[in-house]
């Protein structure tokens, strides 16, 4: 299935790229999310007419994400959790807990923007968490997990 990208998609392309994707990926993700349109003659002409508008919208999203990243740069978040004597948590701290703590600290972050490549946090200590605000904007936030 050939599609025209309306937004930057990681590992696929940028705005205006005409790419070939598997049909299921196109129908179930790219098209419903508004990230692409099918590459028909009409859609190609419509895209070329709206290209400047879409690029301006993308630039606005990047500048908004950069502004949020600047707010997050100086932020240090502390989360208190029940822990045993050796520093192991009873339970874990996941993306939702981190997003709620950052939002409570004053910067709105969705749980889908929090990246934990090693999985959930299960011990007390200091961690550096990646917050991906946009495909091009990633900010590191210092997180301190303390025992209650």
From Swiss-Prot:
Coiled coil: none annotated. The keyword RNA-binding applies. Gene3D superfamilies: Ribosomal protein L9, C-terminal domain, Ribosomal protein L9, N-terminal domain. GO terms for cellular component: ribonucleoprotein complex; ribosome. GO terms for molecular function: rRNA binding; structural constituent of ribosome. Pfam families: Ribosomal_L9_C, Ribosomal_L9_N. Keywords: Ribonucleoprotein, Ribosomal protein, RNA-binding, rRNA-binding. InterPro entries: Ribosomal_bL9, Ribosomal_bL9/RNase_H1_N, Ribosomal_bL9_bac/chp, Ribosomal_bL9_C, Ribosomal_bL9_C_sf, Ribosomal_bL9_N, Ribosomal_bL9_N_sf. It comes from the Bacteria. The keyword Transferase does not apply. One of its GO terms (biological process) is translation. Belongs to the bacterial ribosomal protein bL9 family. Binds to the 23S rRNA. This is Large ribosomal subunit protein bL9. The lineage of its organism: Bacteria, Pseudomonadati, Pseudomonadota, Gammaproteobacteria, Cellvibrionales. The gene is rplI.
